[in-house]
From Swiss-Prot:
GO cellular component: host cell plasma membrane; membrane; virion membrane
Function: Catalyzes the removal of terminal sialic acid residues from viral and cellular glycoconjugates. Cleaves off the terminal sialic acids on the glycosylated HA during virus budding to facilitate virus release. Additionally helps virus spread through the circulation by further removing sialic acids from the cell surface. These cleavages prevent self-aggregation and ensure the efficient spread of the progeny virus from cell to cell. Otherwise, infection would be limited to one round of replication.
Reaction it catalyzes: Hydrolysis of alpha-(2->3)-, alpha-(2->6)-, alpha-(2->8)- glycosidic linkages of terminal sialic acid residues in oligosaccharides, glycoproteins, glycolipids, colominic acid and synthetic substrates
UniProt gene name: NA
Source organism of the structure: Influenza A virus (strain A/Seal/Massachusetts/1/1980 H7N7)
Main location: virion
Binding-site positions, substrate: R116, R150, E275, E276, R291, R370
BP-aspect Gene Ontology terms: carbohydrate metabolic process; viral budding from plasma membrane
Modification note: N-glycosylated.
Protein name: Neuraminidase
Gene3D superfamilies on file: 2.120.10.10
HAMAP family: INFV_NRAM (MF_04071)
Disulfide cysteine pairs (residue numbers): C90-C418, C122-C127, C182-C229, C231-C236, C277-C290, C279-C288, C317-C335, C422-C449
Membrane topology, as annotated: Single-pass type II membrane protein
């Protein structure tokens, strides 16, 4: 073969290879375009797409060819629904600890945030702690003076339940010095109260977006529950009070849908004074056990029909008194009037679960101070003035400080055909009781849930040695 023939032959081979490379490139482009169009056509479906991409690169005559394999795994996303309060409370034979954050003990060496008024609230993904921070950490000099409840520096945060609140694990929600929060199954509503005592404003958020505001109606410390609110079929109910803490005040029951007020009611029934309600849901109803800061050492109760969006109120009927401070227990209670006596006022946030023979009430062990905590089983305490204690379980011994307490329920626990009642106890440390050692006031938290079988005993105090902070 002469040189010219060799040249033509090699040129032909090169042209053939080039055409082959070009065809591969065109087919690769067509494949990618078709896959892209198929993805766009499927976007109107409710799919979750997981893609696994494998790239192999081959060099042919200085041309890079990418072979791409795409594996689509399509699963239909779970549909979200509004929470329906369609179960009764579970029977409880005792209480077990499900979380304890030991925040003050950790705070001796870690940057733990100063908080108070903590509570627990759940959603479809689990439960978290909520608390009002003071804009500082325990070891920070700004912690001096954090005994004050209402300042412009406070705000609501949430943290993993059982972990001490630090900057890195805290999720900011809203600015304010009084709060409540609850999940309706689709989104979370949060309310914070901010501003001056005589001209406060409540800000309402749904799914973290500001939806409305509520201006003071009595110009005297507008305030709300300091524990979770409750929702049913898209409607969330909140109890708010404005007015004197030591005489007649003005309480409203407000109904919200997606953070907007759809109805409000002035307090009805025989309760004289309402503050800091601890609410739970069951059987299309919401029951709130509250604080009478004016007269009653027996706790007022608000019963709310969520379908009718109507309520009534009375007092716990039992003569076993559960506010602090309080006089001695009475042999006969009163369903419609406050039980007074020395010491009586002012009070502390508390809770109860009212379920006929399955009724449990919480209270401090000391009748005069916020120390110790116990759970009392008092069948029919909500309806029978003669009801008495049948069981007692110590939660915090009387030699240790307690504080506020409140109820919560994981309504999304599908493992049970009933709602298991749960509660938390705030364990306050620092001022005023320990002013000898520190200038700050903060808390840790312990949370407990019901057990269907009898349990053992134990005390679960804060546990910090306050002198270590001196």
């Amino acid at each position: 073969m002469n040189p010219n023939q060799k040249l033509f032959a090699l040129s032909g081979v090169a042209i053939a290879l080039s055409i082959f490379n070009l065809l591969i490139g065109i087919s690769n482009v067509v494949l990618n375009v078709s896959l892209h169009l198929k993805n766009n056509n499927d976007q109107d479906k409710n799919w979750t797409c997981t893609s696994i991409t494998q790239n192999n690169t081959t060099l042919i005559e200085n041309t890079y060819v990418n072979n791409t394999t795409v594996i689509n795994k399509e699963t239909e996303a779970a549909k979200q629904n509004y929470l329906m309060l369609n179960k009764s409370l579970c029977k409880v034979e005792g209480w077990v600890v499900v979380a304890k954050d030991n925040a003050i003990r950790f705070g001796e060496s870690e940057q733990v945030i100063v908080t108070r008024e903590p509570y627990v609230s759940c959603d479809p993904l689990g439960c978290r702690m909520y608390a009002l921070h003071q804009g500082t950490t325990i070891r920070n000099k700004h912690s001096n003076g954090t005994i004050h409840d209402r300042t412009a520096l406070r705000g609501l945060i949430s943290t993993p339940l059982g972990s001490p609140p630090v900057v890195s694990n805290s999720d900011f929600l809203c600015v304010g010095w009084s709060s409540t929060s609850c999940h309706d199954g689709i989104g979370r509503m949060t309310i914070c109260v901010q501003g001056n005592n005589d001209n406060a404003t409540a800000t309402v958020y749904y799914d973290r977006r500001l939806t409305t505001t509520i201006k003071t109606w009595a110009r005297n410390i507008l305030r709300t529950q300091e524990s979770e609110c409750v929702c049913h079929n898209g409607t969330c109910v909140v109890v708010m009070t404005d007015g004197s803490a030591s005489s007649q005040a003005h309480t409203k029951v407000l109904y919200f849908h997606k953070g907007l007020i759809i109805k409000e009611e002035a307090l009805k029934g025989s309760a004289r004074h309402i503050e800091e309600c601890s609410c739970y849901g069951h059987d299309s109803k919401v029951t709130c056990v509250c604080r009478d800061n004016w007269q009653g050492a027996n706790r007022p109760v608000i019963e709310i029909d969520m379908n009718a969006m109507e309520h009534t109120s009375q007092y716990l009927c039992t003569g076993v008194l559960t506010d602090t401070s309080r006089p001695s227990d009475k042999s006969i209670g009163d369903c419609n009037n406050p039980i007074t006596g020395s010491p009586g006022a002012p009070g502390v946030k508390g809770f109860g679960f009212l379920d006929s023979s399955n009724t449990w009430l919480g209270r401090t062990i000391s009748p005069r101070s916020r120390s110790g905590f116990e759970m009392l089983k008092i069948p029919n305490a909500g309806t029978d003035p003669n009801s008495r204690i049948t069981e007692r379980q110590e939660i915090v011994d009387s030699n240790n400080w307690s504080g506020y307490s409140g109820s919560f329920i994981d309504y999304w626990d599908e493992s049970s055909e009933c709602y298991n009642p749960c509660f938390y106890v705030e364990l306050i440390r620092g001022r005023p009781e320990e002013a000898k050692y520190v200038w700050w006031t903060s808390n840790s938290l312990v949370a407990l849930c019901g057990s269907p079988v009898p349990v053992g005993s134990g005390s679960f105090p804060d546990g910090a040695q306050i002198q270590y902070f001196s």
